[in-house]
């Protein structure tokens, strides 16, 4: 954040929200270069010292303006007339420049909002993706229905650019950005353009996509606030609108005449919304009628305001006590715990049944097996196989790689209610490691274990993750000398969420 502020001070003489002049500033690309790997894309093709070149950027922009798009034939659609022979190199140069530029105007707003909220010290904990689950444990036990929604992707990059236009007023900059995306779409098929663009230029795509999500969420929050604070009559009118800012007077008359007795059912203060990446969850306590209303408005909002088609099957409404929903690699549902309490009053005895709710969060075993099979650690049935690609490494490096994967998975899934599936995953990784070592030494698994010692080899796979546990629990173990307390029992009974996890594990399948 401080590095960006320095460069913002140097660009003060430019008019606010005018980004086009910054394209030709060398420090913009130097900033992008400093945050990347030394094998950066900002290099001269025939240079001596592998540094980025502002001259290349200027040449590419000049070529973009000089290109005549009317003479491009359909037979040459696979060839890129602008980018030439080194199209990937040139394309990423411009894309990184655009990514840096569109981020600059919003960084001061982000820093000021964080300072006003006074959450700088705990910002890392707020950023943790596992901070969602304590919220679910506190709120979802009182709810009954959940709507699992997958946010649709924009069908064209132009939609993302149009959303950004509401925030940044610079005609020249957006003209160049559209010209750049137009040249990009000429040599990429239309159906694959958005996916190819997101893979080759994740920084620029994520920025544009986050603005798309932010825009739709701002409208959703407006709906949510109105549903809580408006009177019932206004609230009912608001819910019957398809186009949110039109046709209000007519709907007032319709609702006042036909639906005056059903107005109280529309109010739902216990509605909760959670989103991560391209998936969101909407939970409510009332009957699923209100959830259906919200889903209809989501679909109309995406289709009418963003021109994005959403398939109906991407939105599912389920009862929490009967169905589970998938979020961040976990399967979660609300489990009903029934217990019988005996009560005695004078000479009469009563049996009272108490039903309590508990959020059950478990490790999805089958999706993990699919991820391990895709990574070539086992087959589709879960049988461990060797990893011949790693056979060229030393024994220590092979063991360290498997241990790192195992520890990361245990660290990520430590908040699970039951850890039996996690122990089976550790067993698969252990046997895959042994088979990889046996393949390297050109021996069988049995002969390799007899030679190395099966008891001492890879014992870290079955040790408890006490080094991962917080230091508070370790101190508690040292202070408590009673045999009734055990860290292992505490670990099995309670869930522990780590707030240092900022990204999903590579093997986590959250489809």
Swiss-Prot record:
This is Maturase K. HAMAP family: MatK (MF_01390). One of its GO terms (cellular component) is chloroplast. One of its GO terms (molecular function) is RNA binding. Belongs to the intron maturase 2 family. MatK subfamily. InterPro entries: Domain_X, Maturase_MatK, Maturase_MatK_N. It is found in: Plastid, Chloroplast. It comes from the Eukaryota. Usually encoded in the trnK tRNA gene intron. Probably assists in splicing its own and other chloroplast group II introns. GO terms for biological process: mRNA processing; RNA splicing; tRNA processing. Keywords: Chloroplast, mRNA processing, Plastid, RNA-binding, tRNA processing. Its main location: plastid.
């Amino acid at each position: 954040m401080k590095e960006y502020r320095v460069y913002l001070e140097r660009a003060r003489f430019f008019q606010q929200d005018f980004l086009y002049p910054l394209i030709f500033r060398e420090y913009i690309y130097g900033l992008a270069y400093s945050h990347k790997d030394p094998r950066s894309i900002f290099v001269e093709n025939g240079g001596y010292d592998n540094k980025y070149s502002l001259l290349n950027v200027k040449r590419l922009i000049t070529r973009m303006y000089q290109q005549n798009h009317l003479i491009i034939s359909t037979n040459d659609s696979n060839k890129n007339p602008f980018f030439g022979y080194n199209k990937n190199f040139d394309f990423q140069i411009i894309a990184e420049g655009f990514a840096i530029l569109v981020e600059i105007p919003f960084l001061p707003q982000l820093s000021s909002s964080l300072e006003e909220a006074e959450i700088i010290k705990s910002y890392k904990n707020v950023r943790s993706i596992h901070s969602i689950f304590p919220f679910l444990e506190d709120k979802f036990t009182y709810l009954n229905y959940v709507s699992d929604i997958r946010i649709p992707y924009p069908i064209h990059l132009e939609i993302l650019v149009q959303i950004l236009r509401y925030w940044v007023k610079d005609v020249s900059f957006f003209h160049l950005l559209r010209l750049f995306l137009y040249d990009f779409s000429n040599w990429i098929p239309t159906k694959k353009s958005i996916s190819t663009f997101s893979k080759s230029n994740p920084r620029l795509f994520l920025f544009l996509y986050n603005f798309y999500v932010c825009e739709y969420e701002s409208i959703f929050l407006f709906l949510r606030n109105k549903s809580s604070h408006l009177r019932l009559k206004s609230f009912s009118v608001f819910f019957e609108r398809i186009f949110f800012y039109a046709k209000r007077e007519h709907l007032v008359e319709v609702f006042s005449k036909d639906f005056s007795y059903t107005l109280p059912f529309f109010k739902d203060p216990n509605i909760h919304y959670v989103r991560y990446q391209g998936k969101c969850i909407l939970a409510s306590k009332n009957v699923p009628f209100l959830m259906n209303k919200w889903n209809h408005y989501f679909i109309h909002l995406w289709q009418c305001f963003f021109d994005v088609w959403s398939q109906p099957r991407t939105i599912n409404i389920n009862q929490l006590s009967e169905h589970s929903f998938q979020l961040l690699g976990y399967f979660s549902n609300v489990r009903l715990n029934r217990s019988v309490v005996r009560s005695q009053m004078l000479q009469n005895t009563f049996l009272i049944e108490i039903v309590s709710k508990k959020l059950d969060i478990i490790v999805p075993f089958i999706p993990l097996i699919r991820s391990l099979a895709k990574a070539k650690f086992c087959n589709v049935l879960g049988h461990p196989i060797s990893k011949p690609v790693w056979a060229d490494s030393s024994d220590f490096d092979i063991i360290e790689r498997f241990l790192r994967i195992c520890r990361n998975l245990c660290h990520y899934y430590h908040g699970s209610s039951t850890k039996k599936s996690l122990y089976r995953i550790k067993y698969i990784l252990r046997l895959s490691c042994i088979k990889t070592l046996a393949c390297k030494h050109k021996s069988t698994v049995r002969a390799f274990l007899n030679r190395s010692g099966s008891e001492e080899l890879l014992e870290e796979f079955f040790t408890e993750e006490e080094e991962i546990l917080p230091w508070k629990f370790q101190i508690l173990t040292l202070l408590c000398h009673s045999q009734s307390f055990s860290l292992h029992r505490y670990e099995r009974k309670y869930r522990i969420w780590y707030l240092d996890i900022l990204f999903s594990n590579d093997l986590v399948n959250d489809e």
